[in-house]
Amino acid sequence: MGDVEKGKKIFVQKCSQCHTVEKGGKHKTGPNLHGLFGRKTGQAEGFSYTDANKNKGITWGEDTLMEYLENPKKYIPGTKMIFAGIKKKSERADLIAYLKDATAK
């Protein structure tokens, strides 16, 4: 798996404008990601998801996030996440390592 510290830097640069990770964190443009691993798409309480997100029906984990974060709109056509994705697999692995750590605390 990736490097948590490198992943934190990637999160701050590319994700934190729209997402929070801490327990009880507020939703921004995107949902709070606390408890992400093991949760189905479109299930963060209190966030308004597109039908595409709600109906995707996968459970978030290392493999699903690796594919999603490469090209979100390809993985979930109709998502309102406007992020283009992270092409480098090593950067995605670092981000996932950080998310796995930060969203479980």
UniProtKB/Swiss-Prot annotation:
- Which coarse location class describes where this protein primarily resides? mitochondrion
Q: In which residues is heme c bound? A: 15, 18-19, 81
The cellular location(s) given in this protein's UniProt record come to: Mitochondrion intermembrane space
The entry's keywords: Acetylation, Electron transport, Heme, Iron, Metal-binding, Mitochondrion, Respiratory chain, Transport
Pfam families, per the entry: Cytochrom_C
PTM summary: Binds 1 heme c group covalently per subunit.
Q: Which Gene Ontology terms of cellular component type are present?
A: cytosol; mitochondrial intermembrane space
Q: Which residues carry this modification: N-acetylglycine?
A: 2
Which cysteine pairs are joined by S-S bonds?
none
The entry's family comment says:
Belongs to the cytochrome c family.
Function summary:
Electron carrier protein. The oxidized form of the cytochrome c heme group can accept an electron from the heme group of the cytochrome c1 subunit of cytochrome reductase. Cytochrome c then transfers this electron to the cytochrome oxidase complex, the final protein carrier in the mitochondrial electron-transport chain.
> What is the designated name of this protein?
Cytochrome c
Task: Kindly list the organism's lineage.
Answer: Eukaryota, Metazoa, Chordata, Craniata, Vertebrata
